[in-house]
């Protein structure tokens, strides 16, 4: 990537570029192993996530399950795919009917139809992009999620017609290695609004 003139942003190395310099135009945000605890335990919910950010805009994204080979991809303006087939987010509107992936323990007042804590943020979010996956995701933790954990996945969700926001209203698109966010995603705006309300009250 450096030889091609791309900078790289990852949790382990920070933001680096060719010959140690940061390339300002194209940055690849990468998480080589999302869900490392799951991987160590042999659980089939871990992934590699990549997102190309050009001039501050996410343009190409991929989240690949390292155990099953399932691959979610998206190109800006070109929609989203799973294993090469077009996908769209579902139409779930109500939290009480939804199955939600959560990060950290939810409060007792959080009452979707069901929730799961799967341990791999990128895969949790990417699954929202396709009917049959989670209806939404929410992070109840205190700002521990880095951009490498979610940027590729929210790009895929948005291209599939889903929606994403930060629980505290901040921009999710950042190339600051020290920035942390609380991403919330959903198949529909109505469900996102309910999830954001739940996040604010936690």
Task: Describe each region flagged by the PLM.
Residues 7-12, 30, 39, 117-119, ...:
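General beta-strand structural signal in soluble alpha/beta enzymes
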Residues 4, 22-25, 42, 55-59, ...:
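Short coil/turn connectors at secondary-structure junctions
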Residues 87-202:
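An extended, acidic
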Residues 13, 78, 85-86:
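Well-ordered beta-strand scaffold positions
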């Amino acid at each position: 990537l450096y030889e091609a003139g791309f900078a790289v942003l990852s949790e382990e190395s920070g933001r680096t570029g060719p010959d140690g310099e940061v390339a300002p135009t194209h940055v690849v945000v990468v998480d080589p192993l999302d869900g490392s605890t799951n991987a160590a335990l042999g659980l089939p919910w871990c992934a590699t996530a990549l997102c190309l950010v050009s001039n501050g805009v996410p343009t190409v994204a991929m989240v690949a399950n390292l155990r099953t080979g399932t691959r979610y991809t998206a190109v800006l303006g070109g929609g989203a795919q799973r294993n090469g087939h077009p996908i769209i987010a579902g139409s779930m509107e109500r939290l009480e009917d939804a199955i939600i992936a959560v990060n950290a323990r939810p409060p007792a007042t959080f009452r979707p139809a069901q929730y799961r804590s799967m341990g791999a943020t990128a895969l949790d979010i990417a699954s929202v992009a396709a009917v049959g996956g989670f209806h939404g995701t929410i992070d109840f933790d205190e700002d521990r999620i880095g951009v490498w954990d979610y940027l590729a996945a929210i790009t895929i969700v948005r291209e599939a017609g889903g929606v994403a926001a930060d629980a505290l209203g901040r921009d999710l698109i950042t190339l600051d290695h020290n920035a942390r966010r609380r991403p919330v995603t959903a198949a529909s705006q109505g469900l996102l609004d309910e999830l954001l309300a739940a996040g604010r009250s936690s």
